[in-house]
A protein has these predicted regions:
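Conserved helicase ATPase core of P-loop NTP-dependent helicases/translocases
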Residues: 194-223
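Post-DEXD/H (motif II) to motif III coupling segment of the RecA-like Helicase ATP-binding lobe
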Residues: 80-135
Length: 304
């Protein structure tokens, strides 16, 4: 019979607010062999191992199932993904969670996005834990908000803006709904003279290598796979080619811009969540962009 006192602590804070740094500081207080970090993101796990070396044990859920390593303190990073992925195509994530926490005295859940439904499910964990504590430093909010958020009239309008960007000015991030669209749009932009990097599900762990070879592409084109984990260069513009319709993922994807507090803008199809946004100013900006586009085309045809 297991009689060890078990505490569960949930720490919510915005993306890019230093949760990984907090783990590093925790390691300075505790002994290295007391901490285990479980990351559902292989790319992030690889990055942490490279950063921390043997100071902190970091594993994906799949790696843990092979090694079965236990520690007094276990930290589950990006815990919201346990609900999204553990309830669908990676059910072993829940098996890992309950088995590890059963033999740990302190269990920490780190996330930037915890929905009401997730909170209700976590409250049911009281059957396993003696105490559940929530440290809320900001949930489902952005630390660095975009300096401009433009709600586009349609996808075609956004694509027109993308295709009229200036090559090599800065790095833009384009989110597509489907992997086939990622590759087809990258081919189209490459044919127009832009440099592009792509990333779809299963490829995030190779993104760091791609960025080493080309650290400042014109466009990074991806599915939601780049909403988490992978370190990206400074992103000045984020384009959404589809309505996200999920606050958690919208927060994570939008937070890829301005990671270090720089200005960035977002052009999307969703009405922004938690941002000061004026529909009239948005309409005026759309009309202004259309006018500039019209003048540009007219000048082009006059020259030809």
């Amino acid at each position: 019979m297991h009689t060890k006192s078990q505490d569960l602590t949930i720490l919510t804070s915005p993306p890019a607010s230093g949760k990984t740094y907090w783990i590093s500081k925790l390691q300075e207080v505790l002994k290295s062999d007391q901490i285990l970090v479980i990351s559902p993101l292989r790319a992030l796990a690889d990055e942490c191992r490279e950063k921390w070396g043997e100071k902190i044990c970091v594993m994906t859920p799949e790696e843990w199932l092979v090694k079965k390593t236990f520690r007094e303190v276990v930290i589950f990073d990006e815990f919201h993904l346990f609900f999204y992925w553990g309830d669908s195509f990676r059910p072993m994530m829940w098996e890992v969670f309950f088995e590890i926490s059963l033999f740990s005295s302190q269990t920490w859940l780190l996330t930037a996005t915890l929905s009401e439904e997730m909170k209700e499910d976590i409250s049911l964990f009281s059957t396993q834990f003696d105490q559940i504590l929530w440290l809320d430093h900001g949930n489902q909010v952005l630390k660095f908000k975009p300096t401009r958020y433009l709600k586009a009239p349609d996808k075609k309008w956004i694509m027109s803006q993308i295709e009229n960007e200036i090559p090599a000015k800065d790095v833009k991030l384009v989110f597509c709904q489907y992997r086939e669209e990622v590759f087809s749009y990258a081919r189209k932009l490459t044919a127009s003279g832009f440099t592009c990097l792509t990333c779809v599900g299963g490829e995030s762990r190779f993104m760091a290598m791609k960025l080493k070879n080309n650290s400042s592409p014109d466009f990074i084109i991806s599915t939601t796979v780049l909403s988490h984990g992978v370190n990206l260069p400074d992103i000045k513009t984020i384009y959404f080619l589809y309505p996200v319709n999920n606050l958690d993922f919208w927060i994570q994807m939008t937070a890829r811009g301005g990671r270090r507090g720089q200005n960035y803008k977002v052009i999307a199809l969703d009405v922004p969540q938690g941002l000061e946004w004026n529909p009239w100013q948005n309409t005026i900006h759309i009309l202004w962009q259309n006018l500039l586009r019209f003048i540009s085309l007219k000048c082009f045809f006059l020259k030809t």
